[in-house]
Amino acid sequence: MPPKKKKVTGLIKLQIQAGAATTAPPVGPALGQHGVNIMEFCK
């Protein structure tokens, strides 16, 4: 059985180059304050 979908609680728009996402500002704090797992996103 597939995992249950999570409800969307917010929308974050970021313009970053492909493969350039890091945990450093401004990307890390922007994701962190919305509860996004930063390391999972940057993978």
Curated annotation (Swiss-Prot):
GO cellular component terms, A-Z: ribonucleoprotein complex; ribosome
Gene: rplK
Coiled-coil spans in chain: none
GO MF annotations, alphabetized: rRNA binding
InterPro entries: Ribosomal_uL11_N, Ribosomal_uL11_N_sf
Family stated for the protein in its record: Belongs to the universal ribosomal protein uL11 family.
Role this protein plays: Forms part of the ribosomal stalk which helps the ribosome interact with GTP-bound translation factors.
Subunit structure comment from the entry: Part of the ribosomal stalk of the 50S ribosomal subunit. Interacts with L10 and the large rRNA to form the base of the stalk. L10 forms an elongated spine to which L12 dimers bind in a sequential fashion forming a multimeric L10(L12)X complex.
Top-level taxon of the source organism: Bacteria
Identification of the protein by name: Large ribosomal subunit protein uL11
Gene3D superfamilies in the cross-refs: Ribosomal protein L11/L12, N-terminal domain
